[in-house]
Amino acid sequence: MDIYEHKKSFMERQIRLLNRPMRPPKDWKLPLKSGQLSESVVETVFQRLQLRIQKHAKLNYSHQATQHVAAQIRKLYEQNSAIEDITFLNPLFYGEIDLSNLDSVKSLPHPWPFQKESRPVEKDEEQEKFNRLTGELLGLLTTLSELEQERSELEQIEKMLEPFEDGPSSIHTNMWKKNPELISTLNSTNTMVAKINSLLRGVSFPSLNNDNQEASLEDEIRSQLFEKTISDD
């Protein structure tokens, strides 16, 4: 049964109740002997009231009037359930939007598509309320985003300070563990220094008063180091 038939049936039942004969209750009399109304007077009052009710029902609750009221009620129900065309909106707007996401809140439509039957004053009030709440939510989410970024930066700083947690004695050990490229570079440097020291033990250092002597010493060390490297390979 649709809304029209349901409401029409309800009103017809109420009208039939109005047409039922009215009678006073059996215990309407008070236990007082003086000032009592006679039963005939009470029955006459009820009869006249019944006639007035029936006349009122006939004038105001006719079959055509009942149909008209039921149709108006159905129209109101349809208007309450119908809103403006929002097919252009994202499906998230059908009760699934994540209000904790900054991008989702920014994508909310402005102005919001309110119901068609809303009066202009109501729409303005609702729009003002919507704008205020949206602004507050955007402010909170922006602050939250900034705090999360700050936390990420602090976590990076904390990770960089991990080698210093156990004091100076463990700094070098932690740096060696955290940076394998540094280990490889230092090993190569130590090997090169050892080779140079080994070569320098057999080289006599002449006076370094002129540039030619400095150049000849440098060439000799480079030549011996190069030959030593080839022989080792």
Curated annotation (Swiss-Prot):
GO cellular component terms given for this protein: cytoplasm; kinetochore; microtubule; Mis6-Sim4 complex; nucleus
Main subcellular localisation: nucleus
Pfam name, any one: FTA4
GO biological process, one term: mitotic sister chromatid segregation
Phosphothreonine modification, residue list: 189, 191
Subcellular location(s) per record: Nucleus; Chromosome, Centromere, Kinetochore
Subunit structure: Component of the inner kinetochore constitutive centromere-associated network (CCAN) (also known as central kinetochore Sim4 complex in fission yeast), which is composed of at least cnl2, cnp3, cnp20, fta1, fta2, fta3, fta4, fta6, fta7, mal2, mhf1, mhf2, mis6, mis15, mis17, sim4 and wip1.
Family to which this protein belongs: Belongs to the NKP1 family.
Function: Component of the kinetochore, a multiprotein complex that assembles on centromeric DNA and attaches chromosomes to spindle microtubules, mediating chromosome segregation and sister chromatid segregation during meiosis and mitosis. Component of the inner kinetochore constitutive centromere-associated network (CCAN), which serves as a structural platform for outer kinetochore assembly. Fta2, fta3 and fta4 associate with the central core (cnt) and inner repeat (inr) region of the centromere.
Stated name of the protein: Inner kinetochore subunit fta4
Source species: Schizosaccharomyces pombe (strain 972 / ATCC 24843) (Fission yeast)
Gene from which the chain derives: fta4
